[in-house]
Amino acid sequence: MKKIDVKILDPRVGQQFPLPTYATSGSAGLDLRACLDDAVELAPGATTLVPTGLAIHIADPSLAAVMLPRSGLGHKHGIVLGNLVGLIDSDYQGQLMVSIWNRGQDSFTIEPGERIAQMVFVPVVQAEFNLVEAFDATERGEGGFGHSGRK
């Protein structure tokens, strides 16, 4: 199994705040926590950057990571990622910050140590571009939006 080097920058991680974990053996996402000194109140429509206390260097160009919102925060409170999905390239070497957006109607308080996002490692396939005049014909052709029907 491939291992990814995740450095802990904030000494509170593993002490005051739990180490990042997978909630179950079948979890794809690794929970990320708000590494804050004090609670942060986020007004409706507002965004803020929240540190995780972690730094990462994936190093393998065949891998990347994506940061995703936690479903409960989005559904129950309107708390999602400000950039919708965070992409972490294999050559990035800095701290993981989470852009949090309150799209809800009420203020929301982010507590120190609260699980705020999840990170999933994914394979990467880079495109190779070739100039062509046309594609080989297929049954579908250029049929786009709704072309294959609803049933």
UniProtKB/Swiss-Prot annotation:
Pathway: Pyrimidine metabolism; dUMP biosynthesis; dUMP from dCTP (dUTP route): step 2/2. It comes from the Bacteria. Keywords: Hydrolase, Magnesium, Metal-binding, Nucleotide metabolism. Substrate binds at residues 70-72, 83, 87-89, 97. Its EC number is 3.6.1.23. GO terms for molecular function: dUTP diphosphatase activity; magnesium ion binding. It catalyses: dUTP + H2O = dUMP + diphosphate + H(+). The keyword Magnesium applies. The keyword Magnesium applies. It is an enzyme of class 3 (hydrolase). GO terms for biological process: dUMP biosynthetic process; dUTP catabolic process. Its cofactor is Mg(2+). Belongs to the dUTPase family. This enzyme is involved in nucleotide metabolism: it produces dUMP, the immediate precursor of thymidine nucleotides and it decreases the intracellular concentration of dUTP so that uracil cannot be incorporated into DNA. PANTHER family: DEOXYURIDINE 5'-TRIPHOSPHATE NUCLEOTIDOHYDROLASE. This is Deoxyuridine 5'-triphosphate nucleotidohydrolase. It comes from Salmonella typhimurium (strain LT2 / SGSC1412 / ATCC 700720). The gene is dut.
